[in-house]
């Protein structure tokens, strides 16, 4: 009898786990609906702005989505595929960044939130996996953790609510489209001449490539392990030479790794649409 009860208990536990796993919406439709509604494409689709005033009127829908993320147990998350995990973490980062802005709106820059002893990126204002979490914990301690995903393109997917940052995507990231979405975000950002350009004999790129340059020199092969190992920024820029420069001669210099590299000033102004 005891063994029968034990078997029933185990079966029930497995059933509950499977129901829980099935219950999470990996299409992230709730977030998809919100960004489709409140993200405005600019610069020919290479950048975006966010209508935070209108977003604030959909606060209940945003809260419901963020609550669905917080409800996912860590054990369930660990059982997902890497693309599912990454899509979850990227959307979570972007969703909680919007929430942080709305909590402090109106604000001219995300850097105006908090101070020396209350870093906005280390503020524990939400929960994931039953733990107090903060934005840096998602980006730097999880997404960028060596050996976890090894995917430099994630820098073009997470959005820090700033003009200098890669755009907030106008759709949710999903596992089935992740590689295409990451590549498209990369090309959009690199082709935006306000943030990356070849000028006066120099390749001028975003400060992102300076702050996180180790991500382009650690031999990363992408989340699926299929990307040729990334060993240097110069080698990676060479892959995107036709995106980074407009003139064929300039593209050739980048492709050959002969371009001098400089960094553009980062614009921390809020990416708000008016």
Model-flagged regions — what are they?
Residues 18-20:
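N-terminal signal peptide c-region/cleavage motif recognized by signal peptidases
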């Amino acid at each position: 009898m005891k063994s029968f009860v034990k078997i029933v208990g185990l079966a029930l536990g497995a059933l509950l786990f499977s129901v829980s796993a099935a219950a999470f919406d990996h299409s992230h439709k709730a977030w998809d609906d919100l960004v489709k509604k409140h993200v405005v494409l600019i610069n020919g689709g290479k950048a975006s702005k966010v209508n935070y005033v209108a977003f604030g009127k959909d606060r209940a829908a945003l809260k419901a989505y963020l609550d669905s993320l917080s409800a996912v147990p860590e054990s369930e998350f660990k059982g997902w595929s890497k693309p599912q995990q990454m899509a979850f973490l990227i959307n979570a980062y972007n969703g909680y960044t919007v929430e942080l802005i709305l909590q402090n709106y109106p604000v001219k820059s995300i850097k105006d939130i908090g101070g020396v002893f209350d870093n906005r990126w280390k503020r524990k204002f939400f929960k994931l996996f039953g733990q107090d979490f903060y934005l840096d914990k998602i980006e730097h301690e999880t997404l960028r953790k060596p050996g976890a995903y090894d995917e430099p393109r994630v820098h073009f997917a997470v959005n820090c609510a700033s003009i200098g940052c890669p755009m907030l995507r106008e759709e949710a990231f999903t596992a089935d489209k992740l590689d295409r979405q990451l590549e498209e975000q990369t090309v959009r950002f690199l082709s935006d001449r306000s943030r990356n350009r070849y000028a006066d004999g120099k390749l001028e790129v975003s400060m992102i490539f300076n702050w996180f340059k180790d991500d382009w020199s650690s031999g990363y092969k992408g989340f699926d392990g299929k990307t040729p190992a990334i060993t240097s920024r110069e080698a990676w820029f060479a892959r995107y030479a036709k995106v980074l420069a407009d003139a064929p001669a300039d593209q050739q210099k980048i492709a050959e790794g002969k371009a001098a590299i400089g960094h553009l000033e980062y614009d921390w102004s809020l990416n708000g649409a008016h």
